[in-house]
From Swiss-Prot:
Belongs to the guanylate kinase family. It comes from the Bacteria. Its main location: cytoplasm. This is Guanylate kinase. ATP binds at S22, P23, S24, G25, A26, G27, K28, T29. GO terms for molecular function: ATP binding; guanylate kinase activity. The gene is gmk. Residues 15-194 form the Guanylate kinase-like domain. CDD domains: GMPK (cd00071).
Amino acid sequence: MSAPSSAPALIPRRGMMLVLSSPSGAGKTTISRALLAEEDGLEMSVSVTTRAPRPGERDGEHYHFIDVARYMALTKDDGLLEHARVFENYYGTPRAPVEAALARGCDVLFDIDWQGTQQVAEKARTDLVSIFILPPSVGELERRLKGRAQDSDAVVAARMAKAMDEISHYFEYDYIIVNDDLDRSIADVRAILRAERLKRARRIGLAEFVNRMRGAGE
């Protein structure tokens, strides 16, 4: 579990939900991994799913694996910040562990699409910071997808079509990063994260800190 960030340690703050969205191949996963490796006080949101674990997946690390009855109960009780059905399986982000992390000053990283981001925004807009990662061009995105050498031409074409739909929702996000240079894009996301941590509204201990300072100066 990540420790709360210490920027600055004197003033307690509430954590934030940091959402990264992008079309497949734009670099979101690579950027997310770099953030988790480099930033203190940042942890990855772990989704629930009703599908069976795949080889190598561990409960509580990759997903929380639950049955359909438990999933439906969470949905009914508003226990999910966002949820979706993908083919025959259900996925969602449990609210309770995210709320607990925010309350102790930890930031939570989300790897979700624009639809999930909309749902989170409806339930917790003040805690949300959203970033959309764009490729530098359509041609570069297609080159990256083909460079994976793991998908057929038909699958690449389908991913490109989906990417155009996803990109059309760019205006719903707080920040836009064009990932033409990976190192710079990672630095930009880290800069956003650090600036958002300093926002007055998130620094829940600020009034007490200032009052103590004023009292000491009298």
